[in-house]
Every structure is written in C-alpha cells, then in structure tokens.
Amino acid sequence: MRKAIFLRLAMALALLLTVNVNVMGDTLRKGGSIVGKIESNGDVRLNGSIVGRFESNGDIRVGGSIEGRIEKNGDIRKRGSIIGRVESNNDIRINGSIVGRVEKNGDIRYNGSIIGRAEQMTDVRRVAVMYFFGFFNL
C-alpha cells in the first residue's frame, strides 16, 4: 500500500517537473505572432520543430553543427569570425554600427522600430542572436 502511494507521488512530481521545464524559456514574437522559443535547456524551436541549440559554453548549433559562438564579452562569432556584438547596455552592433537593441521589457528594436518581442527573456545575448545575426531563419 505504501509503495503504491509513494509511486503515485513520484509520478506526479515527475509530471510537474516535466511541465515546468517545457513552460520555462523565451517565447519569441515577430509582428505579434509567436514564431519560436528558446527552451530552458537551450533548444531552439521554430514553428514547433527543434532547429538548433544554444550550448552552455556559448556554442551555437544549427542542425547539429556548430555554426557560431556567443563570447562572454558579448562578441558574436560565425564560423570563427566576429560578426557583431551585444553591448552591456543591450545595444546590438553589426560591423561596428548600432543596428538595434533588446529592451529590458523584451521589446526588440531594429533601427528604432519595434520588430518583435521576447517574453520571459532570460538571456539577452541569445535573444539578440535570434533576431539580428541570421543563424536561424526567424
């Protein structure tokens, strides 16, 4: 009897943990519509399919291959070359010029205009990679 109750509680706890993992993460919107999600484990989903992953060491994987890297100082690399930077104030630079910004409230600005939004934003650099650096077709 006690074993059965324990197993039921363990299964309920496992189910709750699974639901929480799937709920957490950055929901990405463009033009008001949900277009993707960065899950808490780093998986990148576009239109429901996993298309890549942000590794904890900064590597950016697209379709299983390492395509780039997010450096600790904010530099964004693609195939080894620096292609841009996420500044500490959340400005986005490409080729040295400021082209956009990730606002603290999650709004994504490109040349001053809001082009999207990241809800429950957990990592500004990952969000910037999704909208500005072309690793994923967002």
Regions found by a protein language model. Name each.
Residues 2-45, 49-51, 56-57, 65-67, ...:
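Long terminal segments
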